[in-house]
Amino acid sequence: MAEFISLYSGSSGNSSVVRCGERYLIVDMGKGVRTTGAALKALDLNISDCAGILVTHEHSDHVKGLSTFLKKNPLPVYGAAATLDFLDANGIVPVSCEMHSVSGGEEDIGDFGVTAFPTSHDVPCVGYCIHTPDGKTMTIATDLGVLTPPVHEALSGCDLVALESNYDLHMLRSGPYPYYLRSRIESTRGHLSNDECAAKLLELVQEGCKKFALCHLSQENNTPMLALQTVFNTFGAAGVIPEKDCVVQTQRRNEVSPVLEF
């Protein structure tokens, strides 16, 4: 059985694990080594069983903890070429670690097959479609302002989808953020709203996907209840019954979320 586990998720830091048997991959590391290490320890995950770290992009809420972690644990790092160039130029990845570009087709990383796909953000950014050794498929896509054709393709046919549900539009527009920041978040190079996420999840559940993780919720412009309720309202209007037809789970900001098997 494959598992998706969010170590922490939100605007202050993101990291998750995809595990199958003893082997696993880490996706991003946006908090310090103490926080990440404690999360891995709580899950009884040994560093020696990690096949590598997948990096989505260069923003600090996705790479803040990498440098210190990699000095102690020189794991291979995978990402888009532009992201790896940034990590290298800023000394984030020690010379003892291998770096591998994943801008082409499927890469064999340990026992996993990993395909990167571009997402629309204000720096070069990718999501990952991961095929597990037991034949399951999951896709993680965060930090995207719009669902482009490559994203639609990557999300289709998965057993589990982890998708950004960053903000509630009313909270964002009535909140304390200045206009330029609100505009950035709402733009096609910003983040995905609850409504946009819910509409896509409805398409996916109608195609047969049964497991969903709502990721990267904003602390200032969203709540877990709002994100879930938006999905449930969208599903309900189409006759889809959550918990009967599928599982939808928000990911916790500062602690490990419940395991999602797929």
Q: Where do the model's predicted regions map?
A:
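Conserved beta-strand hairpin/beta-sheet module of binuclear metal-dependent hydrolase folds
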Residues: 1-43, 126-143, 160
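Active-site neighborhood of phospho(di)ester-bond hydrolases with catalytic His/Asp-centered motifs
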Residues: 27-30, 50-58, 78-81, 139-142, ...
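Active-site metal-binding motif and surrounding structural segment of the metallo-beta-lactamase
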Residues: 33-79
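Active-site environment of divalent metal-dependent phosphoester hydrolases
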Residues: 59-63, 84-86, 124, 146-149, ...
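Metal-dependent catalytic neighborhoods of phosphoester/phosphodiester hydrolases
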Residues: 64-73, 88-91, 222-229
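Metallo-beta-lactamase
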Residues: 81-135
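Cap/insert and terminal regions of metallo-dependent hydrolase folds
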Residues: 149-249
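Short, basic/aromatic-enriched C-terminal tail that caps enzymatic domains
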Residues: 246-262
